Amino acid sequence: MKKLKVAILYYSSTGVNYQLAQWATEAAQSAETEVRRLKFRETAPQQAIEGNDAWKAFHNSEENKRETEASLDDLEWADVLIFSVPTRYGSVPSQVQSFIDTTGGLWFEGKLANKVVTAMTSAQNVHGGQETTLLSIYKTMMHWGAIPVAPGYTFQESFEVGGNPYGTSTQTDGTGKVLDDVKPGVEKQV
């Protein structure tokens, strides 16, 4: 039987969504899938990065530097797409949207249809737009013809990690720390 190909696509300014993507990678590998963990290209001005100590520290870290950037070939390759992105004003960050805006050719050729998609997110406060961020990802995926798969309330860990039916979401303190114990939720969602 052919192994499922899983692309874990993340953007992380301070390391929180990198951590979620690592947990998702471990969970996908334990399910004996072929996995690629890929980051979205950083497009923020250097001045913005330098103005935030946590962002600067993660951006310049060895772990961030050795991660591979996502490409359109990765989207075409994958059977399953797992997104982990921070919330920006109730939507995805510009780095993620810029990448999504380049997928028109794949979409037009039908190469994004029937891919299974799920997503997770983080924000600095409890009601920081996590649910709308996940819905904005799923809305785009529906335009692609992909198949969004949210965890819903199908496992106990969902309630223990904030109860977001659209995907695992967590709160961060802005320094790169995950404030909630969401690892079990990430593992179940994957």
What is each of the regions a protein language model found here?
Residues 1-111, 174-189:
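N-terminal beta1-alpha1-beta2 submodule of the flavodoxin-like/Rossmannoid cofactor-binding fold
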Residues 13-15, 20, 47-51, 120, ...:
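Accessory recognition modules or surfaces
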Residues 86, 92, 130-131, 169:
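Gly/Ser/Thr-rich beta-alpha loop segments that engage phosphate groups in nucleotides
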Residues 101-108, 125, 143, 167-168:
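Alpha-helix boundary/capping detector
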Residues 113-161:
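Short, glycine-/small-residue-rich phosphate/pyrophosphate-handling segment
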Residues 147-190:
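Glycine-rich phosphate/pyrophosphate-binding loop and the adjoining helix
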